């Protein structure tokens, strides 16, 4: 490697590059050095992808996931899985060599137990993608509620700037406003949504439709209500919000500075008796109790055992797709085994599992996949 120290003039730098290229050098391609390391066997494909993830990480959580991956956590897990699958395949294929003698080298009970364990491990990795994806790209948080309840004021308070327009006129927010905030090393993507209500205004109606769409995509829903509203009215709003599987919802009683402590306490008690969800009182305008809100958000993510215990968490969409396919092939092998299919068909399903796992670490890959992966790298990596 040659390092050139020169004056900082752009012209001088360009001239040095021109002379180097004239003498036979060429510009490095994106990801070329990492690709060379992969092709030389210094790292597997999942580790190479982790290099790009480390460069692109914009939070401590995203960096932690990428660091675990580049240190070989994936490699060890998938090498172990592939070794077990290869053992199964070799026993099944050995039966084919002695097919005329009707001999079973692979005990079917043991085979079923091993496939069950392998399917569970692959499924657990695949299921971890939901957490890994939101940690890598930011946890989507939808702030929803009626018009003028203080959603935009809350976003401005969290950002410490006037990002969203605040007005006493209902329906001011018609389009979605999205901003990212880092809370203790985790990136949260806050979406300030249009107030939900019946309206004849077509533009406002479009904004409400977008709101409901983003609510379905959010990992966390913050339903903001007026702390002065009766608990029955708040309960009705809560029941109107669609909460999908895996989503979390918290009830935020805003404008607590205009309600008595007794009133807030009674509302909290009534609402928590009917709903097993967090209920928090804040004052977005006065920035009261916002620390409790940010702590609630952080804890909702960090409470996941796999994040705290250092378990493998999948954050790459390509890996998740391969794991889903591997899980499907493993399930087919299990069903085939239970149905008494022949060893050659069983071996074919297991080879398919091996293929999908091999695409993650690079044992099996194509030039198109490599081009797609390394084209995302910056020059010099």
Where are these regions (language model features)?
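Cytosolic ligand/metal-binding cores
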Residues: 205
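Redox-cofactor binding/interface segments in oxidoreductases and associated redox assembly factors
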Residues: 223
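C-terminal-of-GTPase-core extension/linker across diverse P-loop GTPases
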Residues: 60-182, 199-201, 213, 217, ...
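Conserved beta-strand segments of alpha/beta enzyme cores
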Residues: 26, 187-189, 278
């Amino acid at each position: 490697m040659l390092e050139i120290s020169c004056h900082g003039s752009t012209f001088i730098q360009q001239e040095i590059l021109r002379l180097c290229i004239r003498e036979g050098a060429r510009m490095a391609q994106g990801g070329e050095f990492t690709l060379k390391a992969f092709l030389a066997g210094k790292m597997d494909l999942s580790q190479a992808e982790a290099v790009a993830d480390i460069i692109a990480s914009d939070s401590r959580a995203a960096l932690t996931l990428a660091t675990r991956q580049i240190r070989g956590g994936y490699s060890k897990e998938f090498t172990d899985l592939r070794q077990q699958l290869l053992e199964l395949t070799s026993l099944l294929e050995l039966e084919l060599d002695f097919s005329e003698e009707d001999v079973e080298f692979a005990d079917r009970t043991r085979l079923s137990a091993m496939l069950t364990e392998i399917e569970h491990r692959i499924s657990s990795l695949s299921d971890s993608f939901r957490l890994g994806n939101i940690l890598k790209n930011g946890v989507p948080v939808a702030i929803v509620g009626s018009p003028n309840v203080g959603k935009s004021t809350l976003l401005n308070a969290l950002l410490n700037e006037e990002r969203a327009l605040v007005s006493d006129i209902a329906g001011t927010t018609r389009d979605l406003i999205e901003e990212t905030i880092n809370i203790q090393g985790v990136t949260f993507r806050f979406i300030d949504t249009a107030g939900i209500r019946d309206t004849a205004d077509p533009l406002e109606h479009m904004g409400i439709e977008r709101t409901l769409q983003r609510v379905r995509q959010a990992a966390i829903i913050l339903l903001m209500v007026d702390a002065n509203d009766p608990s029955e009215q708040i309960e009705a709003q809560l029941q109107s919000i669609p909460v999908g599987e895996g989503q979390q919802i918290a009830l935020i009683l805003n404008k607590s500075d205009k309600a008595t402590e007794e009133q807030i306490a009674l509302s909290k008690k009534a609402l928590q008796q009917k709903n097993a969800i967090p209920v928090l009182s804040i004052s977005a305008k006065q920035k009261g109790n916002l620390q409790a809100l940010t702590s609630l958000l952080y804890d909702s993510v960090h409470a996941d055992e796999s994040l705290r215990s250092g378990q493998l968490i999948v954050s790459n969409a390509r890996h998740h797709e391969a794991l889903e396919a591997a899980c499907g092939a493993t399930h087919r092998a299990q069903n085939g085994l239970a149905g008494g299919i022949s060893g050659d068909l069983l071996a074919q399903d297991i080879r398919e599992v091996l293929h999908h796992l091999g695409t993650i670490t690079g044992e099996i890959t194509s030039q198109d996949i490599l081009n797609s992966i390394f084209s995302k790298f910056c020059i010099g990596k």
